[in-house]
Structures are given as structure tokens and as C-alpha cells.
């Protein structure tokens, strides 16, 4: 028995940062899988709730991974990009998320 607590939309928007659009992720969209950068401390149930309420879809499966920081060099100085959490979300068949704006 799971409890679902209604959360404000502003709190859910803070969990999902932005969609990740690369060649690989656009191919995954054909399989009904979408990739998002999410808050590093976010857990799978919170990510699922945020996606379902923001995009009005049903989530079938969520896989998460933390992308480690990458070295970034500017001149002679070496810095790091921030780490982030990546969530790969699979939706049930009739549902879709429109990531590309139609003109």
C-alpha cells in the first residue's frame, strides 16, 4: 500500500531540470523512453510523481544514474563541470511527451 501525497507543482518543477537531447536519446524516443536531468538528491518515486503530474502521462519504468563530473580546461586552468543525475523514463504505450515545439 503506497501513499501518494499531493505536492505543489512548483516543488515538482524543481525536481526536473531539463530534458537531455542527444543523438542517442532521440533514438530512444522512438522506443517511448525519455531522458531528463533531475535533482541529484531526487529519488525514483518523486521523479515518477513529478513526470506524471507535469506531463500528464503514466510511467512504466525509471532508471537513474549519476553522471560524474567532467574535466573542463580553460587555458592553463583545469576545472570541472558539475555532476548531475540522469533519469531515463519509459512510458506506457499510448502516452507521449512532446519535447519539440510545433510551429
Curated annotation (Swiss-Prot):
Main localization (coarse): plastid
GO biological process, any: translation
GO molecular function (one): rRNA binding
Keyword field: Chloroplast, Plastid, Ribonucleoprotein, Ribosomal protein, RNA-binding, rRNA-binding
InterPro entries cross-referenced by the UniProt entry: Nucleotide-bd_a/b_plait_sf (IPR012677), Ribosomal_uL23-like (IPR013025), Ribosomal_uL23/eL15/eS24_sf (IPR012678)
Subcellular location: Plastid, Chloroplast
One Pfam family in the UniProt entry: Ribosomal_L23
GO cellular component: chloroplast; ribonucleoprotein complex; ribosome
Family assignment from sequence similarity: Belongs to the universal ribosomal protein uL23 family.
Its job: Binds to 23S rRNA.
Assembly with partners or alone: Part of the 50S ribosomal subunit.
PANTHER family recorded: 60S RIBOSOMAL PROTEIN L23A
Protein name as annotated: Large ribosomal subunit protein uL23c
